[in-house]
Amino acid sequence: MRITRILLLGLWLVTSHGLQAQRQRTNAYHLEAGGLVASDQTPFWLRANQYGTVPLNGSIARFSAGLKSDYRAADSTGYRPKIDWGYGLDVVANAGATNQVLVPEAYIKGRLGAFELYAGRRRELVGLVDTLLTTGAYAWSGNALPIPKIQIGVPTFTSIPFTRGIISFLGAYSHGWFENTGRQITGSFLHQKYLYGRLGKTTWPFRLYAGFNHQVIWAGQAAPGVLSPNVAVNGQLPSTLRYYPAVVLGSRGNFQNDNVVTSFEENRIGNHLGSVDLAADADIGSWNVYVYRQFLYDDGSLFYGTNIADGLNGLRLKNRNTPAEGAFSLRQITFEYLFTGSQGGDEFVIDDDRRRGRDNYFNHSQFVDGWVYFSRAIGTPFLTPSNEVRPSLNSGGPIGNNRVSAYHLGVSALLFGTVDVTTRLSYSINAGTYPSPYLTLPTQFSGLLTASVPLNILGGTTLNGSLALDSGGLLPNSVGAYLGLRKSGLFSRPANSQAARSSY
């Protein structure tokens, strides 16, 4: 791909010449080799929220290599350049039942003060949720390969002038490109923006957060016979800049005399989805307590209050103390509850505000591939693509199961002062979709136990192991395991003695 070649050339230039010109810059690398085995389909928590790099089926050998340079930190005098740049490149190769080479990260970024511009693929999670043990933010969870995009924004909470740090914000605005391979609708674009505010200084014992994220898939062309004349004219969806304001604003627009727009699009141009988020955190003794709620939207139901029951609720307890040197030190506990069963009700009447239901999360009448990227759900992995559920279950669209009630527990701990252990335990009740409900309500348990052990070899090496289990009526019953060796370090100074932890 032309974009990939440009990114690789840029990375070569900055790594080969940047080290000579800027001694303060740190270039970090990692190498990992391992193997994954599974008795059937890869268990849920071995593949979910892994940025689309773990295959759905089969045992594999796995290799990855990455190179990254972040913005320079402040020096001993507190000086930090207002203009800076960075880059990231990560390549994953899977061999075995699935043979593939993936590039989950390839980006170049630049900073001017608080503002950042980047182009390429970058691992991201959007929304007010716990980032370590979450099931995933509703709309943008890290479950699929990152979508290539150009983005401008303020990536970290930044104080608004004259508020003395009491009011801060972060946000971004981006344009991206969906893949064409394997999709029935090709040439589609991504529009994404988000804005979050924080009330309270970092030194205060209590802080409040609020904001929203907005994603749109729009534009494209369908092959003959894929879309009916009711939703597209000759398979062509509105794709020019004329429609961009309606995409950004989510407004209906005035397209009555437009021969490209059907009556379907008089509602909205594109498929709009996202969440409105509220959160708070408090320092209580030796713990930081973080509570959050994501209110979901995939139509006008949230505006009219008809799907208010749907959402992601979370509670995180994080130990603020330095881990003890004893046999067991608890670092973090995360509880989450996800409910998506309402969707505004089982009726959709566009002229009746109280019956604008059947939101059919992650499915759409025009974008019939669903809210997926390379067949993986872009948002929460608990809204399950049809190809992941048991074949005996009725499937209604690319996302065969989007009416879910899911309970989740995540725990992070340190054993004997060195062994990093995490566990994820999830239980869900699943109803399929409104158009194609399951005849029963299959339940599902998915569990994961991981351990990372630093080794005194090669300087900065970690042994990573994972065990996972799926048992229930939604996914095929399966047991799986991963074992890998990871080496990480720095180019600009001796390798860090603390090895980076695996994403498993």
Where do the language-model regions lie?
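Bacterial Sec-dependent N-terminal signal peptides
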Residues: 1-25, 503-504
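Short loop/turn motifs that connect adjacent beta-strands in outer-membrane beta-barrel proteins
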Residues: 22-28, 69-85, 98, 111-115, ...
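Transmembrane beta-strand segments of Gram-negative outer membrane beta-barrel proteins
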Residues: 22-63, 78-89, 171-175
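Transmembrane beta-barrel architecture of outer-membrane proteins
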Residues: 28, 58-66, 101-105, 147-151, ...
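Transmembrane beta-strand segments that form the barrel wall of outer-membrane beta-barrel proteins
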Residues: 33, 48-50, 83-96, 119, ...
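Surface-exposed loop and membrane-interface regions of Gram-negative outer-membrane beta-barrel proteins
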Residues: 79-112, 124-142, 181
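Internal, well-ordered domain-core segments that constitute the primary functional module
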Residues: 127-231
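Exposed, low-structure sequence patches enriched in small/polar residues
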Residues: 208-212, 222-504
